[in-house]
Structure formats: structure tokens, C-alpha cells
UniProtKB/Swiss-Prot annotation:
It comes from Fremontodendron californicum (California flannelbush). This is Maturase K. Pfam families: Intron_maturas2, MatK_N. The lineage of its organism: Eukaryota, Viridiplantae, Streptophyta, Embryophyta, Tracheophyta. InterPro entries: Domain_X, Maturase_MatK, Maturase_MatK_N. It is found in: Plastid, Chloroplast.
Length: 502
């Protein structure tokens, strides 16, 4: 955030209106390069992101945009430019990456001023993915049904640009965005989310998607506030929630006449809404009839107000006690935990059956093994195989890669109720590492294990125990139950590539 404040040379009063000149500044592309480089370190291997953003290519791009009538790159031109010597697709990726940095500046400044004004303490902890699970443990055990919503994508690119017009007043920037979207992204590739992310800059795509989702979530929050005045203060530090609450006064005037006759359908103070990736969950204590009304409300809202094609099959009603929700790399469900209590009163004794609801979080072992299979760590049955592409590296580098992946998965899935699935994932990675080393040295697995002895095995199995012993030095050595319990971390801000199997 300090970098933005140093680099911005525009007038404070006009900062939100004129962002287009920043596209000609080299430091914008440097910030985009640093963001992509740091993000690539989170995943398994570096994809060579830094090779695309050399200073020479950036200067050539700025000169080309600065020259008159040279910004527009015709679709009839050859993909290889003889003068610049680089593909036009590379320039489009650089423009989208730079625009992603620019368009976030007004929102980042507003978020910074909001957090300073409210004096929100430890706001970074609330950005952790694991911070939502303690909330689910407290709330979901009292709820009955949940809507598993698959959010539809806009059918036209102009819808995304129009959604951004409310926040970015710079017409030139919007024209540049519209040009980039239409020139380098056809309609078929945008409807399919996986293809669109591969063509567009992922950071820009997520920003446009979140800005569009903010529109219909504003209406939902208006209905939510009409039925209940409860408001979560912990979510106030999130960027999207700031604009949700800011639009409530406007929505009361515009949408009250449209929804006032139907508000009685949604009178429920126990409604919890969570959006993540391309999905959303609406959990409530309502009956199945009222949840079915919520289902068709979402479909009608998308079709008639936001022109997004949606079907009722994209919204599923799940009973929490019978079905599991595939949520952020966990299978979450409400499990009934029966307990028997014996009560003694004078000479009479009573046996009381007490059943309590508890949130159960398990690892989706089948999908995770599928991700490991695609990454060539095992076959489709979960049997470990060697990683031939890593066999050319040194032994220490190979071991460090496997240990780092194992540590990241263990760190993310530390909140699992059952550790057996996590042990199986460790087993696959451990023997995949052994087979890779044996393949490199042209030896058998058994002979190579004898050479490594037990020190190699301890690197895979004692990582969490070492961490827990540092956090809880007194409790850990007296009880092993802490290691078998669920631990939620507040430093996880992204999902590992193997966990994000969708």
C-alpha cells in the first residue's frame, strides 16, 4: 500500500477519476511482475512468470501505446510482429496485468482509510481462509439446511464493464478494458471459467468477477437486513463488505417497492451467506419449503435483474445432517454426537441420552488423490509413482520439494476431524520421493531406504509435532491428543494448487 502512495503523482481529489495515465508508467508493470512472482512461489513449480516482464519489453509496449494509432492491434495482423519480435498476445497479457494493478488502487486506498478510521486490530488474521471454519463450528451446528449455489457467469463481456462503471469514473480506462476483453477473449472462452483465466490475467479476472458479484450480493444483503438487524462486525474489514453496506441506503429506495410484498418469505435471523471461488453457500434454520423458495429467488434474480442464464439445477438443497458440503478443500457436514449421561438421585439412577450436533470437517481424499495423480505423484488408484521430471535435480532439492508440498498440505488440512486421510497423503508423497531418488540413482526402493535410514522419514512425520511443541511446550509432551485435534491457522491466505482441484 505504501508503494501505491509513493508512486501516485496525481492530485488527491482527482485520483479516482484519472487512472488511464498510469498505464504508461513502468513501475505499474513492475508491481504486476512482483505480484505474479510471489504468487507463483506458492504453487508447486515456478512457471517462468518473470521471463515475460523484462524492462525492454515493457518500454517497447509503452512506446507502442504512446504512439498515435498504434494502440489498436488489428486482429488481421500476424501474431508475430517483425519489428518488436514478440507475440501480440504477450502485450495483451502485460496490459491486462498492469490494468489489474491500476484498477485496484482506489479500492486499496479506500480499504486503508476504512481500517485506519475504524481502528480494526489484527485485520490480517481475518483474511485467513481458516478463519471462517471457527465461525462454521459455532453456527452450522444449529442450522438445518444449506443451499449449495453454483454462481453463473455473465453471458456478455459488457456486463462486467458496466458493473465497474459505478466505481471507476475514468472513461479511458474503461475503454481500454473493453478493448482488451473484446480483442483477446471470445465469447466461448469466457463462458468456460478455466479457459478464460488462462487467457486473461487471473488477477484482473477475479477483480471483475468480484465486482460483478458485489452487485447482486448487495440486493441479497438488503433483504437480509430487512429481515434481521444483526450485523457481523468481523466482516467489516473486507473490501467487498464495505461497498455492500454503503449501498444499503440506495437499495432501500430502489428495491423496496419491488420486494416489499415478498419480504415475509425471508423472515429468518439465522441466515448465513458465504461466497467462495465460483460457489456460494446459504445456510439457514428454515424448513425445506422455505429453502426451496430461496432457491428460485436466486434463479429469478440472476435471470431478470442481471441477465445471467441460470437453471434451478445450479442451486441444490442439502440437509446438513445427511449431506456434506465441498467447501474450501474440506467436506463439511453436521454430525450427530450421541452421549449417555447417568444421573444418580438418592436411591434412583437415570440414564439420559443426549445427542449434540457437531461440525465435521473431513479431507476429500478421492479428489485429492485425483489431484496428486494429475501432478504425477501417484496413479489413479493412489499408488505412489516416481516423478521423472524432478530426477535431474539434486537429492537435497528433490527432498526439499516433496517436504515442502507435504508441509503445505498438512498445514492446510490441519483442521480435519480424521487424520487417517492426511496420513495416506503423506504416505503417497513420501514414497513418491523415495521412488524418484531411486530412479535417479538407478537403485531399488528397498536399497535406497536402507541408505537413508530413519532420518528421511522423520522429515515427513515430525513437522507438525515440532510446530506444536513450539506453540504449546507444556501441554504437548503431556498429551498427544492435541496433535490429533483440529488446528486452524490464521496465516493461510490462498489455497494450494493440489487442494484447489475444482
Amino acid at each position: 500500500m505504501e508503494e501505491f502512495q509513493v508512486y501516485l503523482e496525481l492530485n488527491r481529489s482527482r485520483r479516482h477519476d484519472f487512472l488511464y495515465p498510469l498505464i504508461f508508467r513502468e513501475y505499474i508493470y513492475a508491481l504486476a511482475h512482483d505480484h505474479g512472482l510471489n504468487k507463483s512461489m506458492i504453487f508447486l513449480e515456478n512457471q517462468g512468470y518473470g521471463n515475460k516482464f523484462s524492462s525492454l519489453i515493457v518500454k517497447r509496449l509503452i512506446i507502442r501505446m504512446d504512439q498515435q494509432n498504434h494502440l489498436i492491434i488489428s486482429a488481421n495482423d500476424s501474431n508475430q510482429n517483425p519489428f518488436f519480435g514478440h507475440n501480440n498476445n504477450l502485450y495483451s497479457q502485460m496490459i491486462s496485468a498492469g490494468f489489474a494493478v491500476i484498477v485496484e488502487i482506489p479500492f486499496s486506498l479506500r480499504l486503508l482509510s476504512y481500517s485506519q478510521g475504524e481502528e480494526v486490530a489484527k485485520s490480517h488474521n481475518l483474511q485467513s481462509i481458516h478463519s471462517i471454519f471457527p465461525f462454521l463450528e459455532d453456527k452450522f451446528s444449529h442450522l438445518n439446511y444449506a443451499l449449495d449455489v453454483l454462481i453463473p457467469h455473465p453471458i456478455h463481456l459488457e456486463i462486467l464493464v458496466q458493473a465497474l462503471r459505478y466505481w471507476v469514473k475514468d472513461a479511458s480506462s474503461l475503454h481500454l478494458l473493453r478493448f482488451s476483453l473484446y480483442e483477446y477473449c471470445n465469447l466461448k472462452s469466457f463462458i468456460t471459467p478455466k479457459k478464460s483465466i488462462s487467457i486473461l490475467n487471473p488477477r484482473l479476472f477475479l477483480f471483475l468477477y468480484n465486482s460483478h458479484a458485489c452487485e447482486y450480493e448487495s440486493i441479497f444483503l438488503f433483504l437480509r437486513n430487512q429481515s434481521s438487524h444483526l450485523r457481523s462486525t468481523s466482516s467489516g474489514v473486507f473490501l467487498e463488505r464495505i461497498f455492500f453496506y454503503g449501498k444499503i441506503e440506495y437499495l432501500v429506495e430502489v428495491f423496496y417497492n419491488d420486494f416489499q410484498n415478498n419480504l415475509w418469505l425471508f423472515k429468518d435471523p439465522f441466515i448465513h451467506f458465504i461466497r467462495y471461488q465460483g460457489k456460494a453457500i446459504l445456510a439457514s434454520k428454515d424448513t425445506s419449503l422455505l429453502m426451496n423458495k430461496w432457491k428460485y429467488y436466486f434463479v429469478d434474480l440472476w435471470q431478470y435483474y442481471f441477465y445471467m442464464w441460470s437453471q434451478s439445477g445450479r442451486v441444490r438443497i442439502n440437509q446438513l445432517s445427511k449431506y456434506s458440503l465441498d467447501f474450501l478443500g474440506y467436506l463439511s457436514s453436521v454430525r450427530l454426537n450421541p452421549s449417555v449421561v447417568r444421573s444418580q438421585m438418592l436411591e434412583n439412577s437415570f440414564i439420559i441420552d443426549n445427542t449434540m450436533k457437531k461440525l465435521d470437517t473431513r479431507i476429500p481424499i478421492i479428489s485429492l488423490i485425483g489431484s496428486l495423480s494429475k501432478a504425477k505423484f501417484c496413479n489413479t488408484l493412489g499408488h505412489p509413482i516416481s516423478k521423472p521430471t524432478w530426477a535431474d535435480s539434486s537429492d537435497s532439492d528433490i527432498i526439499d520439494r516433496f517436504v515442502r508440498i507435504c508441509r503445505n498440505l498438512s498445514h492446510y488440512h490441519s483442521g480435519s476431524s480424521k487424520k487417517k486421510s492426511l496420513y495416506r497423503i503423506k504416505y503417497i508423497l513420501r514414497f513418491s520421493c523415495v521412488k524418484t531418488l531411486a530412479r535417479k540413482h538407478k537403485s531399488t526402493v528397498r536399497a535406497f531406504l536402507k541408505r537413508l535410514e530413519s532420518e528421511f522419514l522423520e522429515e515427513f512425520f515430525t513437522e507438525e509435532e515440532h510446530v506444536f511443541s513450539l506453540i504449546f511446550p507444556r501441554v504437548f509432551f503431556t498429551s498427544r491428543k492435541l496433535y490429533r485435534g483440529r488446528i486452524w491457522y490464521l496465516d493461510i491466505i490462498c489455497i494450494n494448487a493440489l487442494v484447489n482441484h475444482e
